[in-house]
């Protein structure tokens, strides 16, 4: 005798938590590389962000009368906190990451109704607010540890984050100024300054050639390579789709190489741009957010290309050296329109004008 049961009759182990866990795992190599080049600060920031995220998720669950496990089990809050922690300078004051996580989870996620309801990428909302509100703290990137006379120890890292000075009394800006020829900004600032202020062809060529080497010496090339490898793993495991990162990187690369070709004097800038800043981070781990990105196959290509175009415009012609966060948020606004006009044709219907 057969037993009648209700649908669904097929089940999948691809739960939300599994997807989030894969994404977190794919970010860990970049986390380790960032620690290798920039010190213990990244681990402290990540621990602080994740701990606060857990507290916020529990508090929201209590306020809404839900079981605590209901909000913690999907790991979305932890992923948001980790993304934000890896996006800010490792030795930013503790209150920077605290404000960022609160804004990302409370205002950008739970105010809209929680996971799946938010219109904008929560981590990028938090990051953009921090960048606009606290530009000094958000641009205080230490040079790689190998370039520092006295790299911060674990005790120094805690002291810098919670007391703004090392155990010997040096601030982040003093550590930055102690290294000749190295500024607190990334290689993107150097590219922008070189293109805008140097007119001599020989000098410009030499400086822009040096930028590509700075990407590797400064650690940004290795960090982006780690994000690239992690992103390729996610595509292989079908955790994310290939359309968004390929369209984003392809559009940006095409425009960057075209700019280099037209300028005639710019060499290596496109390569340096692709492997510096948050380019690979944004392409594989931020723009691919399944809630705030386009959901149709054609829409993913359009969305990714739009993000790549906006990053190009901001980096080459805007005031900010990176621009990934603002590009993703601006593209999020266009998602409903993109999805509306890229819906695939229903099986059995004819191509024609949309009614």
From Swiss-Prot:
Record GO biological process: electron transport chain; transmembrane transport
Membrane spanning stretches: 15-35, 36-56, 66-86, 87-107, 128-148, 215-235, 239-259, 275-295, 297-317, 318-338
Pfam family of the protein (one): NQR2_RnfD_RnfE
Top-level class of the enzyme under EC nomenclature: translocase
Record keyword Electron transport present: yes
GO cellular component terms, semicolon-separated: plasma membrane
Superkingdom, natural source: Bacteria
Annotated signal peptide: none
Principal location listed in the UniProt entry: membrane
Its membrane topology: Multi-pass membrane protein
Cellular location(s): Cell inner membrane
InterPro entries xref list: NqrB/RnfD, RnfD_bac
Free-text function comment from the UniProt entry: Part of a membrane-bound complex that couples electron transfer with translocation of ions across the membrane.
NCBIfam families according to UniProt: PRK00816.1 (NF002011), rnfD (TIGR01946)
Similarity remark: Belongs to the NqrB/RnfD family.
Protein name: Ion-translocating oxidoreductase complex subunit D
Organism this protein belongs to: Glaesserella parasuis serovar 5 (strain SH0165)
């Amino acid at each position: 005798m057969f037993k009648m049961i209700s649908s669904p009759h097929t089940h999948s182990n691809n739960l939300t938590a599994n997807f989030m866990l894969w994404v977190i795992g794919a970010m860990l190599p970049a986390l380790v590389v960032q620690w290798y080049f920039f010190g213990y600060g990244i681990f402290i920031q990540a621990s602080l962000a994740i701990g606060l995220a857990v507290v916020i998720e529990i508090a929201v669950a209590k306020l809404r009368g839900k079981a605590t496990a209901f909000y913690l089990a999907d790991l979305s809050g932890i992923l948001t906190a980790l993304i934000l922690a890896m996006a800010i300078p490792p030795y930013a004051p503790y209150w920077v990451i605290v404000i960022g996580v609160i804004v990302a989870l409370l205002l950008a996620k739970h105010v809209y109704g929680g996971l799946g309801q938010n219109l904008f990428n929560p981590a990028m909302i938090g990051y953009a607010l921090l960048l606009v509100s606290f530009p000094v703290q958000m641009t205080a990137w230490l040079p790689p540890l190998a370039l520092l006379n006295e790299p911060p120890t674990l005790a120094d890292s805690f002291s810098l984050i919670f007391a703004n000075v090392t155990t010997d009394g040096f601030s982040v800006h003093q550590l930055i100024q102690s290294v000749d020829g190295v500024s607190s900004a990334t290689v993107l600032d150097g590219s922008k300054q070189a293109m805008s202020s140097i007119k001599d062809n020989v000098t410009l060529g030499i400086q822009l050639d040096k930028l590509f080497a700075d990407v590797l010496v400064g650690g940004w090339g290795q960090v982006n390579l780690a994000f690239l490898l992690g992103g390729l793993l996610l595509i292989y495991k079908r955790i994310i789709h290939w359309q968004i990162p390929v369209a984003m990187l392809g559009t940006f690369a095409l425009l960057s190489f075209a700019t280099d070709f037209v300028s005639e004097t710019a060499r290596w800038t496109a390569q340096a741009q692709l492997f510096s800043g948050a380019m690979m981070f944004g392409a594989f781990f931020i723009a691919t957010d399944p809630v705030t990105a386009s959901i149709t196959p054609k829409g993913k290509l359009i969305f990714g290309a739009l993000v790549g175009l906006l990053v190009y415009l901001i980096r080459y012609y805007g005031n900010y050296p990176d621009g990934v966060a603002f590009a993703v948020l601006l593209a999020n606004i266009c998602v409903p329109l993109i999805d509306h006009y890229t819906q695939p044709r229903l099986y059995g219907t004819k191509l024609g004008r949309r009614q």
